[in-house]
Amino acid sequence: MRLRTFLDIDPKLIGVIGGGKRKPTGVVDVALIQSLVRNGEVDDIVAGYGHLVIDECHHLSAVSFERVARRAKARYVLGLSATARKDGHHAIIFMQCGPVRHKVDARAHAAEGMIRHLVRERTTKFELPAVLTTAERPPMPAVYAALAGDDARNDLIFDDVLHAIERKRSPLVLTERKDHLALVADRFSRFVKNVAVLSGGLSAAERKLVESVLAAPESEERLVIATGRYLGEGFDDSRLDTLFLTMPISWKGTLAQYVGRLHRQHAGKTDVLVYDYVDAGVPVLARMAAKRRAGYRALGYSLE
């Protein structure tokens, strides 16, 4: 557990609540907020802590999450978020966590480090199916489905990932659809020795398998494939250095979460690289790509 990296503490004093476990110590406990609420009632244990640290505190606008924060009687409260934004409910964050005390300038942070931040755009030849071209604003779920099923586009991604693995990089393939995740995972499973597939709803046995793959020796090739929703928050693997953004997004906050998976310090890491697949032939996707470019610049990335 990473807490042991920063605290001089007996591991037996670190408790866990959530993920099927309930072993609190009352000293330092790590809990899933969802595990602290049952049938609308907040677990009494919440009131016993003196210091509350809320990761991804932008979720406090959700009713059940705010209930947990309100039930706490902690003297000290710390909220952490990479994606706080004014959404009409943002005042709840400040009510529960207090004012913003510190901001990290992503561009300055990137410039200070010894790790280069690079983006490599890969322009695809993707075109919308005829059935979607008649709509003034084609529905995005249908667009994503068409992207996921485009063989030429998937071939491009597949070749790029294999080349990265050949160059001894540690790649993360990110998609927004479970059917695309399954397709990509099946294809790579025949070519890469260690493949970890991450998505919501994994069984305990599947999670153990993923953990064993993630722990593979650095001398062995390894590929992580995940849905953005799963990896957007809380995932930590310092070995990752290459991101394949296979589905278009536009909001800078989401982009910051995704590329942030690469920013952990790790021995021998000299650069991080994002492969961005730009579908320039589709106006709405081209506009999303333009927003990502602005987002990359704000995050201290350079376009190759």
Predicted feature residues:
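Conserved SF2 helicase motif VI
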Residues: 83-84, 250-274, 292-293
